[in-house]
Amino acid sequence: MAFSFQVSKMNSFDNYNAAIHPKHDLISVNAPVFGKDAKLSPHLAIVLADKGFMLEQVCLPWRYFTDRGFVVEFVIAESIFPPRPPKPNDSYMTGWKSHVLGASKEILDIYSVLCTLNEFNNPKCYRSNGFTFDNFSAVFITGGRNPFVREMLEDPLLHASLVPYIHSCRTIQPDEEVKDNRKIKVLGAISQGAAAIYLAEPNINMKTTTIPAWMERSNSFLNPTPDNSTYPYAATIIPKDKYVSGPYRRVAFTYQDENYYYISGRSNKDIGELSKKMYLMYKQAYKDLNASLRERRRRSTSNRRNSGI
């Protein structure tokens, strides 16, 4: 663990119940930002359910982007009362499933740090008045099959907030005349999280991967009721011409769209690579924007010279 900035703030915990019942008696602190100014640093929103999220899908992106100078904030549906940190899916935290499908010691360590942060203990709420994703440079949508996650992914208020952001992620073309106020916007989704995009904007010209039906079906057999439910599989929600299934085996697989700064993954196995590629996509978007602005200035200068100004 490289959390030198907060190791002293962590309490001892055990692998089974630390992530379910975080035991910290410290005042929440702000996450570190390694840039010169938090206000100037890019902001990432991790969209998650307040209960039942997958630890890997939240902890690893937070760690990766925080280490690269992002301000990472968390977005849930509405305020939690009585106040508590968002809770992960506890069906994988105890018993035999914790050994087969549960989070690693590293992930549990990261979660114990998250539970000391203001950003995690007081997440933003997309149902609140005036909320917008426009304040973020990157948005990452988590997935899951349990009722709490499903409610979030199908929420029309989440869709309403996502639609304008999705369109702001359109790829900048080399010859495009960008506006002065064009901002860098990138989007990522893991497993069922991709379904929220197509429920929000079913006709968008964007391709994605998500957890394949065969993988989601096999996973559901390991989940207790009501997780093993009649929810439609995520892959069936996405239009066939926009769905990229990936290999028919449990290997890491991500897919980046050509028309939008959007990248997606299928399962927790992909989350590390997905975080890395999403960050590289952000850097590429920044380069594309600067290149377009330089080209616009070059054309403007050339036109003035040709007109004798």
Curated annotation (Swiss-Prot):
Q: Which residues cross the membrane?
A: none
Question: How is this protein named in the record?
Answer: Uncharacterized protein C18G6.12c
Organism annotation: Schizosaccharomyces pombe (strain 972 / ATCC 24843)
What GO cellular component term, any one, is given? cytoplasm
Q: Which SUPFAM superfamilies does its entry note?
A: Class I glutamine amidotransferase-like
Instruction: Extract the GO molecular function terms from the UniProt entry.
Output: catalytic activity
Q: Which Pfam families match?
A: ThiJ_like
Similarity field = To S.pombe SpAC14C4.04.
Recorded hits in InterPro entries, A to Z, give: Class_I_gatase-like, ThiJ-like
- Taking the record's annotation, the residue ranges forming a coiled coil are none
Phylogenetic placement of the source organism: Eukaryota, Fungi, Dikarya, Ascomycota, Taphrinomycotina
